Amino acid sequence: MAENQYYGTGRRKSSAARVFIKPGSGNIVINQRSLEQYFGRETARMVVRQPLELVDMVGKFDLYITVKGGGISGQAGAIRHGITRALMEYDESLRGELRKAGFVTRDARQVERKKVGLRKARRRPQFSKR
């Protein structure tokens, strides 16, 4: 592995992201595509940039990311979690600031399973009194 390269794994819903950061000019590559090409929605791009903006390191690192599984929102959250972990590996003193913003904690919420006899996880069939 290259010198001064830092790694973080992020997960959210059913997505998993592997994030490699190394000093550079602020290039973000996700699955061999740029951030703008990969995420069409501006909100997803903002979520990915959040940890870097919080610690003022937007133009200081090049990010190489591979992400699998889930949808746009889950992948963006997984990438954010991975970037946060990689930044903490780079500099442990950033942990407090990142934790205060809520980026360190893995969001454990998962999709609730559909139950037998119900239409969805909790939605019951319509009740008819007569």
UniProtKB/Swiss-Prot annotation:
UniProt keyword annotation of Ribosomal protein present: yes
Keyword field contains Ion transport: no
Pfam families registered for this protein in UniProt: Ribosomal_S9
The entry's keywords: Ribonucleoprotein, Ribosomal protein
GO molecular-function terms, A-Z: RNA binding; structural constituent of ribosome
GO cellular component: cytosolic small ribosomal subunit
Coiled-coil region list: none
Biological process terms in GO annotation: translation
InterPro entries: Ribosomal_Su5_D2-typ_SF (IPR020568), Ribosomal_uS9 (IPR000754), Ribosomal_uS9_bac/plastid (IPR023035), Ribosomal_uS9_CS (IPR020574), Ribsml_uS5_D2-typ_fold_subgr (IPR014721)
Family under the similarity heading: Belongs to the universal ribosomal protein uS9 family.
Family matches, as HAMAP family: Ribosomal_uS9_B
Record protein name field: Small ribosomal subunit protein uS9
Organism the protein comes from: Pectobacterium atrosepticum (strain SCRI 1043 / ATCC BAA-672) (Erwinia carotovora subsp. atroseptica)
